[in-house]
Amino acid sequence: MIFAVVDILEISIQLLCILLFGTTVINCVSKGRHKDVNAIVRETESKKIVPWSDAKVQIKKFLGDGASGTAYLVVWEDKEVVMKVTGIHPQSISVLHDELLITQKIGKLSKSCHNFLPYHGSIVISDLPAKMMRNSECVNHLAIFMGYGGTVLADWRTSDYRRCITIMAQLVLAMRIANDKMKFVHGDIYMMNILIAPTTKRWIEYNIDGKTITIQTFGIIPQLIDFSKSWCGADPERHDISRLHTVAKRVGHSLNGSKRDKKKVRQAVKMVGAAKNWKNLCLYRQLFKQVIVHDH
């Protein structure tokens, strides 16, 4: 009887999602019914829990702790990658399951959009070394392997105002693509969840609505990371746009440049916060005019 009531509740919520947003949502209540670690294990490539001794992970460097896990630079399957490790406890199974699914989807986008890192695989690990554990009560840990990015935006500085603008322009276009393809909402865009990677590419291309938009990189590519608060399906784009506007203002404040250059950054991003959606923001010429190569 109880399960029947829960099923009716879930169906009602999914119907509400469809009425409000036109689709269901990955993070809806149905995901909360994952009862054990096997819900996550089934989504990994190995399909089984792997002892640490068999994981064959070579730790090279500790990168940092975040709210949802710990990151290391490692060698795994003959590749130098970033390993994010998160303890699995009953209350986190649903969240980690969804994060893994979204990370896999976003990883595929990296082939056509440089602002997302490639996904290399995942395993559920048992017997994690004690020195790597944040919660001793977690028997198993989820390890997600991603491409190695750059410097956290919060620690990054520049004296070239054009770099500040290209960061925002690239992120807007990347989010437009992700939103178009999978109705992606990051949910936690802020300075610590954006990496700045150096590049030798002078420009990069984005394919949107059958058009190719070419943007100057000025030697950098911003990359979005951490999908622990992300979801797909519903489409409240204003959530991410508002957060990106906050990031834009902070990047402008941190510019090691003249007052004139800081004003140029402010003018380029001032309307970001007022945009209704990513499509609307992509039409904002003030943001793109100093970094766009061509639009055809």
Curated annotation (Swiss-Prot):
Coiled coil: none annotated. Gene3D superfamilies: Transferase(Phosphotransferase) domain 1. It is found in: Membrane. It is a single-pass membrane protein. It comes from the Eukaryota. InterPro entries: Kinase-like_dom_sf, Prot_kinase_dom, Protein_kinase_ATP_BS. GO terms for cellular component: cytoplasm; membrane; nucleus. It holds the Pfam family Haspin_kinase. Keywords: Membrane, Transmembrane, Transmembrane helix. The chain crosses the membrane at residues 1-21. One of its GO terms (biological process) is intracellular signal transduction. One of its GO terms (molecular function) is ATP binding. This is Uncharacterized protein ZK177.2. It comes from Caenorhabditis elegans.
